[in-house]
Amino acid sequence: IEKKQLKKYIDINVTGNDELLQNALEEKADDRLKNIVATIQDEQNKIIRAKINSPLIVQGVAGSGKTTIALHRIAYLIYNYEKEFKPEEFMIIAPTKFFLNYISNILPDLGVNNVKQCTFEDFAYDVIGKKLKISDSNEKLVIIVNKEFDDINKGKIDIMIKEAKYKSSIKFKKIVDDYLLQIENNYIPKNDFYFKDYEIMSYNNINKLFKETYKMYNYNDRIKEIEKNLISELKKKSLLIIDDIRKKRSKELQNLTGENRIKVFDKYEKIIKLLEKDYKKIVKQYLNQISKKDCIQYYKEFIDGYLQNSDEVMIYLKKNTSNNLQKNEISFEDLAPIMYIQYKIFGIKEKCKIKHVVVDEAQDYGEFQFDILKQILNSNSMTILGDIAQGVHYYRGIENWKKFIDVEFKNVKTVYTTLNKTY
């Protein structure tokens, strides 16, 4: 109230005492934002304010305000958890670039900046470290939708659907896990670490470091830790080794004269200087035995060499994926396994490390896509919004929320709610 005139009102039954939502009604906000905030319903508001720690899953019919909830939940969480989380540690995964353009205009008006906004494909590029050629999912969708009118290729299309579903499943992830275990068992050199004739560390001890001591790290970071251990061990033993080398040199030089004596002396001196000055080089020579592949090469090896032709779906999967990889092309469903291989072997960049993710139109993603998000989050802090009835890429997506929760959040307290009213 200003000069006995009502200038503004706020329904505290909806917005409560949060300055964030109240400020969103200030004059600087455009009419679109005011309309959004003004129409938030009580049931939507309860979802917006749900605690951050548990996974929140919202099944909402068309027009129930899922996107409004997604945007306001991000704003609410950032404001109320500002001491625990930075805005850049939040991420919204949207289905299309068009949708991203829409929310990028709304979030700043809610006082939200620096939140990562991307499609699943964009996030995959960040995790993998390079942009990949992805076949158009819409072309596949057109083929699948027209299946009933294509009697000739109906059987092949059915297998295509099963392949996409299988690649997006937790079952496929478990096969990738088995493959990664095989890589882990063969990752480090099988030989002991020696300097000349001197054992510095046995294979068994190095393997124990790799598989037990540093198992919490990705494979690449484990090697970095092992490198430190090997350098340290080499330094410890270097004085004794140098002393022994000098004794050998003296013994060998006793019966030599002239040029032969100089050659032998120089040979031993070179070894001593290497040991005194270049521990890293010696250790690197040992670790250079480790295979130099990237995540795409590992995925090719997985498809071509590890997967078994157990049934017609797997035969099609192997052939189709292998042909695409030879053309440097992948499908959307290949992103999750490639991301997973990258994450487990090489880790991810700092910019990919997030603490809470909001996924809109979640019904179009499969179990494997959600599982890799959980791995990267290293927690269950997710807001998942979708509508099973509105699945566009239903052939690879979620069919049943209960089954999805049982797979992805088993033994985890999960908040599941439905919005059945269109506003």
Model-derived segments and their meaning:
Residues A38-A50:
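Pre-Walker A adenine-sensing motif
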Residues K66-T67:
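Conserved lysine of the Walker
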Residues I52-L56:
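Pre-Walker A (Motif I) flank of P-loop NTPase domains
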Residues I376-Y423:
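Conserved RecA-like helicase ATPase core segment
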Residues V58-G60:
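Hydrophobic anchor at the beta1->P-loop junction of P-loop NTPases
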Residues A70-L71:
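Post-Walker A alpha-helix
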Residues I1-N23:
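N-terminal accessory nucleic-acid engagement/regulatory domains that precede
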Residues I78-V358, D364-I372, N380:
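Alpha-helical nucleic-acid-binding subdomain
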